[in-house]
Every structure is written in C-alpha cells, then in structure tokens.
Regions:
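Short, solvent-exposed loop/turn segments at secondary-structure junctions
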Residues: 55, 108, 136, 158-161, ...
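Short, solvent-exposed turn/loop segments enriched in Gly/Ser/Thr/Pro and often Arg
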Residues: 106, 265-267, 345
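A C-terminal junction/extension of Radical SAM enzymes
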Residues: 24, 32-36, 41, 189-193, ...
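Cys/His-rich metal-chelating microdomains
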Residues: 55, 59, 63-66, 291, ...
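Alpha-helix N-cap and loop-to-helix initiation/capping positions
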Residues: 77-81, 167-174, 239-244
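Conserved alpha-helical substructure of the radical SAM core
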Residues: 2-151, 233, 240-241, 359-360
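Flexible mid-to-C-terminal extensions adjoining Fe-S/redox cofactors in radical SAM and related proteins
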Residues: 1-44, 282-285, 289, 300-360
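Radical SAM/AdoMet-radical enzyme domain recognition
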Residues: 83-104, 110-226
Length: 360
C-alpha cells in the first residue's frame, strides 16, 4: 500500500466497493488537470471532511474547540445536526459522486448514531472515515465494525503519557485503550486501516521516531501534522530547534524509503522544516489543488474549501444544495486563489491530496 493518506482512501475503496484503485486515481488526476486547463470545475468534490459534532471530550492546547465556546446564530449552545439531516447530506453527496466522507468534530464518537451514520455512508458507496481522539472507541468499536467502518484516524501525539496529556488534555491511558480497540476491530473484522496523527510541537519532537517504531510494530500508519499558529495570541508550541528538526525529518524520510508506516508524503516531509521554521507558510508559488477535490463542512453546515485563514466560507448547505455550493462563484474564486498560491495558508493534510494529483 502506498504511503499517502488519500492514496490509502482509494485503495480501501477498491477493497470495499470493488473499484479499481489505479483507474480512480488516474480519472481524478486527469479530470482536475483538464478542468484547470479549461478554466472549469470538477462535477464533484472527491472528499468531504464533515464536523458532525461541535462538542469534544478532550482539551487540545492548539484546538479552537478547546479555546472557545461555539454558539449558534441565536447565541445559544450550538445546534447538533440530527441523523436525518446528516443522511440528507449523504444523499446529496452520493448523487454528486463523492468518494469519501471523514466524520470528525469536535469528537464524533460523542454522537449516539455514529454506527448508523457509518452504515448509511457505506450503503451509498461513500467510504466512511472516522477521525477521533480514540477515548470512546473502546466502547463503540464493535458497533462500528458491524456498520462496516474500514478507516480509523486517531490523534496520538506521543507515547510519553506526560507529553500526550499536556498537548491533548485527556487521559493517555484512555486514548491508548482506543488504539487497542482499533487493533481488536481489525482482528475481528479484517482489513481496517488504522492511522495515527501526531501534531508536531517543540514538546514532542523527540517522541516522533518512537511513534514510528510503535506504528511499524502494529501495522499502523502515522501522519505528521504541523502546529498551525493561526488565531494564536502567543506561540509557545512551535518547533524552534533547527538541528533537532532536521535530524528528525531526515530520519523520517529515510524510514519512509525503507518501508516504514509513514503516511506523510515525501513532498510534505521535504517542506516540513520550511513550514515549521519560516512562519508557518506554504512554499512560494505553491499550487494547491484541494479546491478541485476537497470540501469542508462545519457543524453549522458552513462550507469551505480550506481551514486556512485566507480562505473564507463559500456557502451554507442549509440554504443551498451541496451541488450549488460546490459550483458557486465564491468557490470558483477561492479555487483559483489557492491554485495560484495566493492563499498564504497552511501545510496540512490537504497537501497529501496535492501529492496524489502530482503523483509525488
């Protein structure tokens, strides 16, 4: 299996739905490049990241949900979308031809219908992906296994309890029980991709290589996420140790070449030092393709094509259909802005979509 998150998605789709991995990737790549050439847009987003729950049971020090209340338009506690509302959006996504939807939050396992949502996506031939802190997975993995979940992403920053709890604000033991639950799920239901994400900061820089060893031993993929300073009044987390960072990144690239379970692409790793040390910005003249394949929905159904600070809301699914939002003038504007490298934004997981399109 290729070491790239979006490549994994299409490889799992081929196993679950009987599609051709090579044909799907080639079709997406050709469609996007043709759309760019003809100043057009694809008929569908390929991947939707959906915040299906605004509440969270962890307190990550770098997360907006942990730093702020999230009121709705009436100034009250935010509205939690019900099952039927979500399934209606799944129907729209299926009609458009969306390939995968990641259920995240907040913490999606705080929902009582997470198994129902997973099954609903599978029935519509949309690959469900669960993005979780793992704490509640110990009590829900059997339900999710029966529902057909085949891709789990768990946030684990470190295997040192003190470092993990400092960054995540929740019990390390509980989170690791979630990882063990995912392993049990794979053992019982088979072919489940387990994928850890670690947010890189100055506090866990030296812990990352140990995480790689753990992932290799358990056939778990590891994605390195960067710490984004957007919205921060002060920055006490960014990596400043140039020598240490270079050593870790160099080793990560060596391990990936040797076949380690590192999901971050070479393109991502090649620019990781630049991002961490040069004011958290993407490389100059970087062309981002995510506007041609990715759509983000928050818990109030606001749609964006990027969480980056320079890319705003493009519409709301309550007021417009998914198709209308994907094709509206704001989306077209931001799509071109991102393609031209004028967003000045982030260096997060969407770069893996870019790597897939550029075949890097």
């Amino acid at each position: 299996m290729e070491g790239n998150m979006f490549a994994h998605i299409y490889q799992v789709r081929s196993d679950v739905f009987g599609t051709s991995y090579e044909n799907e990737i080639s079709k997406i790549r050709n469609e996007i490049l043709t759309c760019i050439k003809n100043d057009d847009c694809p008929i569908t987003p390929r991947f939707i990241m959906f915040k299906v729950m605004d509440r969270c049971n962890s307190g990550c020090i770098y997360c907006g949900y942990a730093r702020q209340n999230h009121p709705d338009k009436d100034g009250c506690k935010s509205y939690i979308l019900n099952t039927n509302e979500l399934i209606d959006i799944f129907d729209q996504a299926a009609e458009l031809g969306v390939d995968a939807i990641a259920l995240n939050g907040g913490e999606p396992l705080l929902r009582n219908d997470i198994g129902v949502l997973t099954e609903a996506l599978n029935k519509r031939r949309i690959l469900p992906i669960l993005m979780t802190n793992g704490v509640l997975l110990d009590s829900k993995w059997k339900e999710l296994g029966v529902a057909g979940l085949k891709y789990i992403i768990i946030s684990i920053d470190s295997l040192i309890p003190e470092h993990y709890e400092f960054q995540r604000g929740i019990s390390y033991i509980a989170a690791m029980k979630g990882v063990q639950a995912a392993l049990e799920m794979r053992k019982k239901y088979g072919d489940v991709i387990i994928h850890l994400t670690a947010v890189l900061t100055r506090y866990n820089l030296e812990d990352i290589l140990t995480l790689v060893d753990f992932c290799n031993a358990n056939r778990i993929w590891l994605e390195i996420s960067v710490y984004d300073t957007y919205g921060m009044t002060e920055d006490k987390l960014s990596v400043t140790d140039r020598i240490g960072l270079k050593r870790v990144v160099t080793k990560l690239k060596e391990l990936k070449k040797e076949g380690s379970y590192i999901s971050s692409s070479y393109e991502y790793l090649n620019h990781l030092e630049e991002f961490c040390l040069e004011h958290n910005r993407i490389p100059q003249k970087y062309s981002c393709y995510s506007g041609y394949g990715i759509l983000l929905l928050d818990d109030l159904l606001n749609a964006r094509t990027c969480w980056g600070s320079q890319v705003g809301d493009i519409g709301n699914i309550k007021n417009s259909s998914l198709s209308e939002v994907w094709n509206n003038s704001k989306m077209r504007h931001y799509r071109k802005k991102m393609l031209g490298g004028r967003c000045g934004g982030c260096w997060n997981l969407c770069t893996e979509f870019n790597s897939m399109i550029r075949n890097i």
